[in-house]
Amino acid sequence: GYLECNKGFITLGKDMGKIVKVPVFVFLIRHLEGNVLIDTGISSRFKETWGKRLNYFIPILKHNIVEYLKDIKINYIINTHLHIDHCENNPFFKDSEIIVQRKEYEIACNPKPYQRLSYPDRVDKNLNYRLINTNLDLFGDETIKIIKTPGHTEGHQSVLLNLTGKKIFIAGDSCYTSENLKNNILPGIIWNADKVMECYEMIRNLKDTLVIFGHEEAKI
C-alpha cells in the first residue's frame, strides 16, 4: 500500500507542507525452512484503527495482505519495528512466529506519550513473539540475516538477504529514502539522530548489495 503524508515526515526540515505518496512494503520470502514475511503492513480496518493518525497520514491500501496470503502458510514474521504501518496485520497471523527486538516490543507495549502516534493503540500480547536482543542468522545459512539498526526507533532491525547469490538489504525505516541517505537528512520520526547517521554509514558500506529503502519505490 501507500501513505499520503507531509514530506516533512520523510525528510526532516525539507519540503514541509508538500504532500507525497510513499510506499509501505511487505516482503514474502520463500525458503526451504519456511515462508518468511518481513513486516505485515496496513490493515484493511485502518479507518477504524488509525484514529487521529489520519490527520497526518492517509493510508491507501493496494492489497489486503491477509486476503492475498490466505492460502500461504507464513512460518515466520520479521517486524523491522512495531510502528503501526509495519505491523498492523500481525494479529491475523496467529500461527506465525514473530521475530522482533525485545526493546522494540517493550516500547510498543508501553510507549511514552510522544511515541503513541506511531505505535498501535494495543499490542496483541497473545501472539507468538520471539524476542531477541542481537543480530540473528535466521536459518544459520546466511540467507536471511536480521541486523540491529537502532535510530528511527530504539529497537529497529533490518534484514540482509542473500538469495541465489544476490544480496538485498531491506532497510525498513533505518533509512526512508535514497534522498535521506545521499544528503544525510534525518527522518521526521526519530529516536536517536546519531544512531540514524550510523545506520546511513553502514548502508553506504554495503558492497554489491541492492538497498530497498523503507518508503521509496523499488524494483527487485
Q: What does each model-identified segment do?
A:
Residues 21-23, 132, 153-155:
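Residues that act as N-cap/strand-start positions at coil-to-secondary-structure junctions
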Residues 2-67, 158-172:
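Conserved beta-strand hairpin/beta-sheet module of binuclear metal-dependent hydrolase folds
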Residues 2-4, 34, 42-45, 84-85, ...:
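Short, solvent-exposed loop/turn segments at secondary-structure junctions
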